[in-house]
Each structure stands twice: as structure tokens, then as C-alpha cells.
Swiss-Prot record:
Source organism of the structure: Mycolicibacterium vanbaalenii (strain DSM 7251 / JCM 13017 / BCRC 16820 / KCTC 9966 / NRRL B-24157 / PYR-1) (Mycobacterium vanbaalenii)
Keyword terms of this UniProt record: Cell membrane, Membrane, NAD, Quinone, Translocase, Transport
Assembly and interaction partners: NDH-1 is composed of 14 different subunits. Subunits NuoB, C, D, E, F, and G constitute the peripheral sector of the complex.
Protein name (database record): NADH-quinone oxidoreductase subunit D
Family affiliation: Belongs to the complex I 49 kDa subunit family.
Database matches in InterPro entries: NADH_Q_OxRdtase_suD (IPR001135), NADH_UbQ_OxRdtase_49kDa_CS (IPR014029), NDH1_su_D/H (IPR022885), NiFe-Hase_large (IPR029014)
SUPFAM superfamilies: HydB/Nqo4-like
Gene3D superfamilies noted in UniProt: Cytochrome-c3 Hydrogenase, chain B
Enzyme class, spelled out: translocase
Domain of life: Bacteria
Function in brief: NDH-1 shuttles electrons from NADH, via FMN and iron-sulfur (Fe-S) centers, to quinones in the respiratory chain. The immediate electron acceptor for the enzyme in this species is believed to be a menaquinone. Couples the redox reaction to proton translocation (for every two electrons transferred, four hydrogen ions are translocated across the cytoplasmic membrane), and thus conserves the redox energy in a proton gradient.
């Protein structure tokens, strides 16, 4: 039988609880085609698959003939749960989706709610600056994890230690400002949960002094490292045509030379007023994506420095909209005792007037009413375009909230990056995408 007469290869759609069907299909496929092929089930419990990601690899020798992703092992039903909570409570759910970039989840959600309410232009400037500062610090911490886990998977353990060490500095800032290291729920519809504590800006300034030097240490370790370049250059190749066909965004897209960044293309939170550059590369491979993430961290430091200057000039300015029908209390402070000024704040609410207490009770228990309609809002997360399609029926709860998570979309590129390459290079390709399974499965 000639090549043109061979039957087409069978396409297997993989879900959960289907290993028997995959094996049966693989055996039938192997019988129909020449060569010796086996199916390797990499994950979902594997140290190199960025969480509970399952890769179904059909290999011939050391060459990957077919690669497919199996997802859903971290499904939490967050989007469905949002339909049973009021609009403000939804922030505590979405922050847990992509758990390495919680502030981007929160900001996208709040921008959608504010657009439905028609209050986008009423958000206090100080609140927008705080949002930008937190997102850019979060971008740095997320990229540090990407480099740390990617280095660990390729055997560069020093990169892992350095990445997680610097990330701890940023998480300490998050803890000072929000009270939590992760899952912060700090950004709220109308502004932020509370103003910065007095010790926050000095801590951020110290961080900005230390981070550039620490990042240069990591660059000195990896940029010209012979082994690192051998494992990443030319690996996981995906050009601009492939990115456009698959809807790929973020560092993977910018590694093809296209300067697509929503902070410049569709500015939000006042990003058009900040001075920074969109980092690109033209290598289209894993090494190019590594370089982009390193350089993006330096650009984020530039933005945070500008945020600090603006915050120093606006001390005492409001951080929540003034409309009391929409605004949750935003003047609570977290103290060393875990309470801060909450006893005094509660006494003020309860002792001001009975009408004020009733209004506060209804605002918190029932929530705000959002006019009927639907919007799509997107922000530039560390992994690409993070979009929210939000639908309201005019009630106090969302009718539907759907997240377009970049990790989910970018995983489509696994087959294009891996097929025809070596099994060991699949690890590099997935690490260069930097998927977070909490965002993929939701």
C-alpha cells in the first residue's frame, strides 16, 4: 500500500476515565500504520507537567508522533458558583482561578461589573493606581514562578531557588497590603478593599531597590548558560501563523515578534499614562519566551516605580467610589492583632444611625443591583489575554460569568509545539507556555 493509499489516522478525543479507550484506539492505530508506536500517559501526577495536566503522547522511539492534552482534573465549578453569590462576593471566587495571578482575575471581574454599572470613569484615581501596582508586582511574581518551575523541570535547581526566593519578597508586600499572601480578594467593584497601610510604600521602595540586582543574578545564571540554551533554543517552535490560527496570546505570541499587549492596544486602569515598552523577540521558541519574561519583569519594575510616585502624591485620597448605594466599606485596616480598626469601624456603623445600619446590612447581605446587559472585558495577564464575558439579568447576582483564560487557550499549542520533537522537549514546550491548571479547569 502506498502512502497515498493509507487510511487516515484516527483522531481520539480524550476526557477523564477513558484510558481503556485510548489504549484500544492506539493499538488499532498501530496496527494500521507501519512502525512501532506506543502511547505514553504523562501525568496528571507528574513533576514536570505544571500541575494536574495530562499529556497523551503517541511516540515512535523517542519521537512524538501525536500529542494531546487531557484537562479537567482541577475543575472547581467557580463560574457556576458565581451565579449563587452577589456581585461583590464573586471576587473571593475568581481570585482562586489562576492562583498565581489573582489580582488579574479580580481586576478583570471588577472592570466588567463597573462597566455594567456605568461607573468606569468614576473609579478614584488612587484606586486605579493601586490596582496597577498590585498587578505589576503580581506579574513579576508570576514570571518568577514560571522561570523557577521551568528551571526545575530542566534540572536547573539554582533557578528554582532564586525564583522562589525573590517571589517571597513580593508575597510579603501582598501580605502587608491585603493581609494575605495569595487569594487576596483585595480589588472590589468600585475600587479596592482598603487603602495602603503606612508601612506599605517603604516596603515597596525597598523591594524596588533589591529586585533589579536579584533579576540580574538570574540573568547571569541562565542567559548564556550553554545547557540552558541547548535545552530551550529551537524547542517548542511556534511562529506567528500558528499563534494566529490557535488564538495564542501573551509571551508565546510576543516571541514571534508581534508587539500585542492589551495594556497598549486596549488600555485600562490608566495604563496609557504609564511609560513602559512592550517586549518582543523573533526566535519563536522557548528561549525567546524566557527572554521576554525576564525583560517584562524589568518593565513591570518601571511601572511600579511610577505607581509609587503617584501614590506618594495622593495620600489620603479616596480608594472607593462615593456612591453609598454601590460602595462597600473601604476604610478597614488590618492590624498586628488581626483586627486593626475593625472594632471602631463596626461601632461607627452601628452607632451612626439605625437607617445607616439597615442600609449597611442590606448592602452586604443582598448586594448591589447591576443593570441588565452583557460585557466583555480583557486584561493582559502574565500568560496572555484574560477576558471576562459577563451577563446580568438586573439582579443582585451574576446570570453568567465566563472567563477566557489564556492558559486554556494556549494549551492548544501543545500539539503544534511537540509533534515531531523529542519526548524530553515536550517538558520544555509546556514550561514555555506556563499554564496554570487552576485557570484552565476553573
Amino acid at each position: 500500500m502506498t502512502t497515498s493509499q493509507q487510511p487516515p489516522e484516527r483522531v481520539v478525543v480524550v476526557g477523564g476515565q477513558d484510558w481503556d479507550q485510548v489504549v484500544a484506539a492506539a493499538r488499532q492505530n498501530a496496527a494500521e500504520h507501519a512502525g512501532e508506536r506506543i502511547v505514553v500517559n504523562m501525568g496528571p501526577q507528574h513533576p514536570s507537567t505544571h500541575g494536574v495536566l495530562r499529556l497523551i503522547l503517541e511516540i515512535e522511539g523517542e519521537i512524538i508522533v501525536e500529542a494531546r492534552c487531557g484537562i479537567g482534573y482541577l475543575h472547581t465549578g467557580i463560574e457556576k458558583n458565581l451565579e449563587f453569590r452577589n456581585w461583590t462576593q464573586g471576587v473571593t471566587f475568581v481570585t482562586r482561578m489562576d492562583y498565581l495571578s489573582p489580582f488579574f482575575n479580580e481586576t478583570a471581574y471588577c472592570l466588567g461589573v463597573e462597566k455594567l454599572l456605568g461607573i468606569t470613569d468614576a473609579i478614584p484615581e488612587r484606586a486605579s493606581v493601586i490596582r496597577v501596582m498590585m498587578m505589576e508586582l503580581n506579574r513579576i511574581s508570576s514570571h518568577l514562578v514560571a522561570l523557577a518551575t521551568g528551571g526545575m523541570e530542566l534540572g536547573a535547581m539554582t533557578a528554582m531557588f532564586l525564583g522562589f526566593r525573590e517571589r517571597e519578597l513580593i508575597l510579603s508586600v501582598f501580605e502587608t497590603i491585603t493581609g494575605l499572601r495569595m487569594n487576596n480578594a483585595y480589588i472590589r467593584p468600585g475600587g479596592v478593599a482598603a487603602d495602603l497601610p503606612d508601612e506599605a510604600l517603604p516596603q515597596v521602595r525597598d523591594l524596588l531597590t533589591l529586585l533589579p540586582k536579584r533579576l540580574r543574578d538570574m540573568e547571569d545564571l541562565l542567559n548564556e548558560n550553554y545547557i540552558w540554551k541547548a535545552r530551550t533554543q529551537g524547542i517548542g517552535y511556534l511562529d506567528l501563523t500558528g499563534c494566529m490560527a490557535l488564538g495564542i496570546t501573551g509571551p508565546v505570541l510576543r516571541s514571534t515578534g508581534l508587539p500585542h499587549d492589551l495594556r497598549k492596544a486596549q488600555p485600562y486602569c490608566g495604563y496609557e499614562t504609564y511609560d513602559f515598552d512592550v517586549v518582543t523577540d523573533d526566535q519563536c521558541d522557548s528561549y525567546g519566551r524566557y527572554l521576554i519574561r525576564v525583560k517584562e519583569m524589568h518593565q513591570s519594575i518601571r511601572i511600579v516605580e511610577q505607581c509609587v510616585q503617584r501614590l506618594e502624591r495622593s495620600v489620603g485620597a479616596p480608594v472607593m467610589i462615593t456612591d453609598k448605594k454601590l460602595a462597600w466599606p473601604a476604610d478597614l485596616k488590618v492590624g498586628p492583632d488581626g483586627l486593626g480598626n475593625s472594632p471602631e469601624h463596626i461601632a461607627k456603623i452601628m452607632g451612626h444611625s439605625m437607617e445607616g445600619l439597615i442600609h449597611h446590612f442590606k448592602l452586604v447581605t443582598e448586594g448591589i443591583r447591576v443593570p441588565a446587559g452583557q460585557v466583555y472585558v480583557a486584561v493582559e495577564s502574565p500568560r496572555g489575554e484574560l477576558g471576562v464575558h459577563m451577563v446580568s439579568d438586573g439582579g443582585t447576582r451574576p446570570y453568567r460569568v465566563h472567563y477566557r483564560d489564556p492558559s486554556f487557550t494556549n494549551l492548544q499549542a501543545v500539539a503544534a509545539m511537540c509533534e515531531g520533537g523529542m519526548v524530553a522537549d515536550a517538558i520544555t514546550a509546556v514550561a514555555s507556555i506556563d499554564p496554570v491548571m487552576g485557570g484552565v479547569d476553573r
